[in-house]
Curated annotation (Swiss-Prot):
The keyword Transmembrane applies. It comes from Rhizobium meliloti (strain 1021). Channel that permits osmotically driven movement of water in both directions. It is involved in the osmoregulation and in the maintenance of cell turgor during volume expansion in rapidly growing cells. It mediates rapid entry or exit of water in response to abrupt changes in osmolarity. The gene is aqpZ1. This is Aquaporin Z 1. InterPro entries: Aquaporin-like (IPR023271), Aquaporin_transptr (IPR034294), Aquaporin_Z (IPR023743), MIP (IPR000425), MIP_CS (IPR022357). GO terms for molecular function: water channel activity. It is found in: Cell inner membrane. The lineage of its organism: Bacteria, Pseudomonadati, Pseudomonadota, Alphaproteobacteria, Hyphomicrobiales.
Length: 228
């Protein structure tokens, strides 16, 4: 179990450092920067690369919602959930801390949103609480369905990380304007702790909505999937 939790920590660390790091450090540099498209691909690439690197050890969850969804679908023992989630959250916080140290080394650094997730006035596009809730539930549910389907025994071995990484890229392309894209409570927690204030007060949604989406996906997969 120690090896599994260690790589969940490392995988989540890489997801936050690579994904949020691209948003904080490179999205607008130089001038236009990598923009929404680049940030979306960065998040997808972090999952793709670490799924290949360490997915064979822990399953490559890197996300509390993924762990919960897999448990509901019967793909992992519920007793492992607490350990996985703690490893993921601590990995995200550690990555946010490293990113803060790097970003604050720039003379004109301003904390701003620090890639935190938000709704209302803190939504990149000014979307409401309801829009944010629906977006996070639906996007997380489909992310889990992609994971559950692509890792099924019927699917050729070795292709799942590609489908999952591209799926996460697509999710970011759609939902960055709405919530800055969470679908991952650990990722949201790390950034919120450094932003504080509004990011902390809105953090509940980025736990509740992804977990609801994950549970829905797990139940749907038990109905339409074929894990027997």
């Amino acid at each position: 179990m120690f090896r599994k939790l260690s790589v969940e920590f490392l995988g989540t660390f890489w997801l936050v450092l690579g994904g949020c790091g691209s948003a904080v450090l490179a999205a607008a540099f130089p001038e236009v920067g990598i923009g929404l498209l680049g940030v979306s691909f960065a998040f997808g690439l972090t999952v793709l690369t670490m799924a290949y690197a360490v997915g064979g050890i822990s399953g490559g969850h890197f996300n509390p919602a993924v762990s919960v969804g897999l448990a509901v679908a019967g793909r992992m023992p519920p007793a492992s959930l607490v350990g996985y989630i703690l490893a993921q959250v601590t990995g995200a916080i550690a990555a946010a801390a490293v990113l803060y140290v790097i970003a604050s080394g720039k003379a004109d650094f301003q904390l701003g949103g620090f890639a935190a997730n938000g709704y209302g006035e803190h939504s990149p596009g000014g979307y409401s609480l309801t829009a944010a809730l629906v977006t996070e539930v639906v996007m997380t549910a489909f992310f889990l369905l992609i994971i559950l389907g692509s890792t099924h025994s019927r699917v050729p071995v070795g292709f799942a990380p590609i489908a999952i990484g591209l799926g996460l890229t697509l999710i970011h392309l759609v939902s960055i304007p709405v919530t800055n894209t969470s679908v991952n409570p650990a990722r949201s927690t790390g950034q919120a702790l450094f932003v504080g204030d509004w990011a902390i007060s809105q953090l509940w949604l980025f736990w509740v909505a992804p977990l609801i989406g994950a549970v829905i996906a797990g139940i749907v997969w038990k109905i339409v999937g074929d894990d027997s």
